[in-house]
């Protein structure tokens, strides 16, 4: 199992936001992390990427926790945040160089991969641009390029469809499918439930910091007794029950 979250209790203070959260993401699997605003999705992600430390429970990637081997743990993750995080003083080219250095990638091979990604997202003529020159959608594309030029075992993608044009959404979904086929594990937080239903293998439904249900669409339909329900139907049913 690539990602294992076990009995995670945590948050931003001594009062836990997350309460015994457990789920897994296997190799070659895309898991949708679903929940209302304030349900605990961002807090869960911040624990996985190491910005927050668990109060109780554990998080492991390929059997290794952050405290056991921080370098190996962090280099196993590629993260695309909801709000792009770029260095204002660095050009697009320098952001790619920084990513190559941080992940200890072969420079020639990484740049070959980067050039393909830059072309896909129509950024190949903008290598000398600074973040101030980019729109929010273009900044999001920079984050996607930097994440997908790595060899990460786990991709964490937070609300990827906000700010992206339809063409970029199509291209991102194609990249996700490609990396899945190559064996990567992918955790995606999203409010776009129809897209999640069409692409995710499994779902983790969060409500008030707890996992209320998890499984494939068929498993969730069986749990809630509605074999024809969409993911949106099931999610609304879960909210009403709780």
Regions of interest found by a model, annotated:
Residues 49:
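Helix-to-loop junction immediately C-terminal to a conserved catalytic motif
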Residues 130-134:
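Conserved ABC ATPase signature
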Residues 97, 101, 108-126:
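Conserved ABC ATPase "signature" region
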Residues 214-215:
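ABC ATPase "signature
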């Amino acid at each position: 199992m690539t990602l294992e979250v076990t009995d995670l209790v945590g948050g931003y203070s001594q009062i836990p936001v997350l309460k015994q959260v457990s789920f897994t993401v296997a190799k070659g699997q895309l898991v949708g992390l679903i929940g209302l605003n304030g349900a605990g999705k961002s807090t869960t992600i911040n624990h996985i990427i190491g910005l927050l430390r668990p109060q109780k429970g554990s998080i492991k990637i390929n059997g290794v926790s952050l405290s056991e081997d921080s370098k190996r743990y962090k280099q196993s993750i590629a993260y695309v945040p909801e709000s792009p995080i770029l260095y204002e003083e660095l050009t697009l080219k320098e952001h790619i160089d920084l990513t190559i250095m941080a992940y200890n990638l072969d420079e020639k091979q990484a740049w070959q991969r980067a050039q393909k990604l830059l072309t896909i997202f129509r950024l190949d003529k903008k290598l000398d641009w600074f973040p101030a020159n980019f729109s929010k959608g273009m900044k999001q594309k920079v984050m996607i390029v930097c994440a997908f030029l790595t060899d990460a075992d786990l991709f964490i993608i937070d609300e990827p469809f906000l700010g992206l044009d339809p063409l970029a959404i199509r291209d991102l979904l194609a990249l996700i499918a490609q990396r899945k086929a190559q064996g990567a594990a992918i955790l995606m937080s999203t409010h776009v439930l129809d897209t999640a239903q069409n692409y995710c293998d499994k779902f983790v439904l969060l409500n008030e910091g707890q996992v209320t249900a998890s499984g494939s669409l068929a498993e969730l339909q069986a749990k809630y007794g509605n074999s024809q329900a969409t993911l949106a139907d099931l999610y609304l049913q879960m909210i009403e029950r709780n």
